[in-house]
Amino acid sequence: GVVELSMNNGPVNTLTSDALFGLRDCIEQLSNDQTVRAIVLSSPFKVLSAGLNIKEARTFDSAQQDAIVRGLNEGFLALYACPKPVICAINGTAIAGGLFFVLTADHRISTPTAKFGLAEVRVGVDFPMGPLEIAKATLSKNDARRLMLRGKSVDAETAKNMGIVDLIVAADDVLPQ
């Protein structure tokens, strides 16, 4: 059937290396489960994911930095390569690393009030290679350049025009879709 993976690291679903390695392991397990036909990514919060906790990331030692980069690479590449259809139910903001949940999905359904962006340039954080390759593969060169270099978010309608979002529906209809 359809499996819903609900991110539950509220209030903004910040990314941690443990969560990203857990995502990788979960996706690999679901990929090999013959009873799973599709995977839905969702969040019970007003934010799909805001990416890393930058204040916390600035205090990482080299081992923690290596772990988060490996987690970002392995977690998002597993999601991107998943052989099952992945649907992202976007009920709110997907910024920085959080946008990669959207970009790795095969079908992306959003509320009209959702915001999307890559804010790394605003806080001086580099893109790990895996997410960078996903952005290059899923966004036009101009859209990737604009999102990465400006660091500003776009609304759902603009995201739809950019191909980030496939469908915009009322908030109550995001998961049922």
Language-model features, listed with the residues they occupy:
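Catalytic-core regions built around general acid/base machinery
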Residues: 26-29, 71-83, 89
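Glycine- (often His-adjacent) and acidic-residue-rich active-site loop
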Residues: 21, 35, 42-77, 94, ...
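Crotonase-fold acyl-CoA enzyme core
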Residues: 80-177
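Glycine-centered loop/turn positions within well-structured domains
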Residues: 10-13, 46, 132, 145
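Terminal peptide-recognition signature
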Residues: 5, 22-23, 41, 53, ...
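A secondary-structure boundary/capping signal
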Residues: 8, 43-44, 50, 91, ...
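Conserved CoA-thioester-binding segment of acyl-CoA-metabolizing enzymes
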Residues: 1-44, 77
